[in-house]
Amino acid sequence: MAAMNTTNHHQGWRMPVPAHSGIYKLHLQAKESLGTAEVRDSVRLPRGIDRNEWIASNMVTLFEELVYMVSAITDVCSESTCPKMCAGKHTSYSWADEKQPAPRATSAPDYMRTLVMYTEDFLSDQTLVPGDGSPFPPAFLPMVKKLCKRFFRVYAHAYIHHFDNFQHFGAEAHLNCNFKHFLYFVLEFDLVGKQDMSPLAELIKMFLETDDRNRTKGKAKSEK
């Protein structure tokens, strides 16, 4: 089995928002809270924070996590092993954007590389993601929804076609943690439709039910 690239996963990647911006500071706050609070609670909009700014800051965090995952499977997800971007036998994905509006078939690695660059361009575009406190444009949220739908496709491909690779190298816990963060975020802000997430419906159901049971147990213990 080919090795997974679990080191240097930020090589060639740049932080798309300025380090001095409010969005970047919120990104650090959101990232820190992931280690100190339940994931479902950590994505909720804090009191007094602009909704779009909070969404933008979390998108930076989700993007970091996506880059890690894409980099981790670079050596096992290739043009030869994954010539088609898909999530199982019956779900395949094409790529389209403003420059090439006609959907085109693509390999999984090409889709993921294109998505990383596309997201990087979006997050660094000050007209779409203002870092100076200016109002967010109407195009911001539709673009976030488009990106989140595509982020999900990468997770679906990773789980369905490469989960054994993550297990083999002991990285499945990291994958699960990142996906749960993504899942609770898109559910909290209604960013990805249920039908779009159907390839991982059973996994999502398991995560939600397990989390509900754990929260119920925790609440019962605290009341004793």
Role assignments for model-derived ranges:
Residues 67-143, 148-152, 156-159:
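Amphipathic alpha-helical interface segments within eukaryotic helical scaffold
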Residues 124-127, 156-164, 184-194:
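Charged/polar positions within long, soluble alpha-helices
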Residues 132-141, 164-176, 198-203:
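Short amphipathic alpha-helical segments embedded in low-complexity Lys/Glu-rich regions
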Residues 171-224:
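Eukaryote-biased recognition of C-terminal alpha-helical segments
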Residues 150, 165, 178-182:
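Extracellular/luminal segments of secreted precursors and ectodomains of membrane proteins
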Residues 1-101:
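The feature captures two recurrent sequence modes
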Residues 50, 106-107, 193:
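Helix N-terminus capping/helix-initiation residues
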